[in-house]
Amino acid sequence: MRNKLNEVKEFDIISRCDTIRIAMFDDPYPYIVPVNFGEEIIGDQVVFYIHTSYGGKKNDLLAKNPNIAFEMDCNHELYYRESNMSCNFRYESVVGTGRVEIVPEEEKEKALTLLMNHYHPESVKFNPKFVYMTQCMKIVVNDMTAKRAMPKKDTPDYKVMQFQGEVRSPHM
């Protein structure tokens, strides 16, 4: 059963995420890629902007079927509670679906500016040569859900567990 307390309606989580993962249709398995992004909210419509080179598997798959699923997450922290001898993981995440559209040439600079603003608020100028060589896409969001598992840190037995080097499976 899903924990209703973890569902979140506000999407401020997006501003804290640094990568969006896009899942596309491929046969026989989905194809997923992590990309950086910018966002814009127009009325009730959420739009994500990404950039890519021209050509490649991602572009080929999106040309066949522009419908995608996406995921982003942030604020990861492994913690331990001595009182009940349990570990858990703090996180915030957003998942959803959307449709990818190519950004027209005359709107590419706006898309790249929104992308840069997600990571750095200062204005930057773009070299027209590189803007021309960059393909921009927008993801028009159909639906999206946010979740948060952020237990309070104010209990005396709450201990953050530091990751030790690489995170890897003991089976590898």
Describe every region a protein language model picked out.
Residues 17-54, 70:
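Short beta-strand segments
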Residues 2, 77-172:
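Charged, gly/pro-rich active-site loop segments
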Residues 55-60, 78:
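Histidine-centered metal-chelating micro-motifs
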Residues 24-26, 52, 72-74, 100, ...:
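Short, structured patches in soluble enzyme cores that scaffold and shape functional sites
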Residues 1-21:
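Short, basic/aromatic recognition patches
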Residues 10-14, 32-47, 76-88:
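Short N-terminal helix-initiation segments at or just after the protein's N-terminus
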Residues 64-71, 79:
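Short catalytic/metal-binding and nucleic-acid-binding patches
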Residues 13-14, 61-62, 115:
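A generic structural signal for nonpolar/aromatic side chains embedded in well-ordered alpha-helices
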